[in-house]
Amino acid sequence: MSLLAGFAVFFAEIGMAIYNRVHAYPFGIYGAERVGKTTLARQLQTRGEVPDIQKRTKGVQSSSRKLIKIDGDVRTIRSSDVGGQAIYWKQWESDMKKRNVQYIIFMIDHRHLNKNFNMDNQLAWQYLVDVILKKRWSNGKKKKEKDYPVAIGIWANKSDLWIDGYDFKGEPSKHPIFEPFNMGIQQLNEIGIPCHKYVVSAKSDSEMVYRGITTMIKDY
């Protein structure tokens, strides 16, 4: 009996490994312009140092599959590169609805720490939160349970540029960079959507990126 159980576990693990490689988890990657969404998309496609990207993304690009490998764990995700200019924010909702996005990565940078009057990150975040909290899509169609994301990651990007510039010794998730987003996080938590805070450099640290993706899928 134990031998049969062992075989069952073995084949179950193989089946799960195949599923994780073949099944693509739909991710939505959103945020204000120039926070590093295109850099993240490039990092997920080709692992390594990403060169500076000057061209701005317009609208919603076609989604594509990305293979995520770290510590022997293999996952496949599907994501689109979506413009962060305010004129494209409405297309975040379209992307979420069309692809039935399960996981969202909302990217921010440190501009609101450098300049208190800069509200780019906060306005984009509140827009996304409002879209998710609404019980109906903008076309009036009522949302179903599957239309809500499983989890949201708030990724503080460009850490290589700002992490050492602030006298902060606590957990990265407690860093002041996340403070303006806590109210939205609480609102999402209240409807059962967990939010995961993460500090990352999409440009230069592929391990941080891949580990962040895998953690979201595993934990939520």
Q: Model-predicted segments: where are they?
A:
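Short, flexible boundary segments at extreme N-termini or domain junctions of P-loop NTPases and their
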Residues: 1-32, 214
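Inter-motif core of Ras-like GTPase G domains
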Residues: 89-132
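Conserved beta-strand/loop subsegment of P-loop NTPase cores
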Residues: 103-106, 136-160, 189-199
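Well-ordered, non-membrane alpha-helical segments in soluble/globular domains
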Residues: 118-140, 169-184
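Canonical P-loop GTPase G-domain recognition
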Residues: 161-220
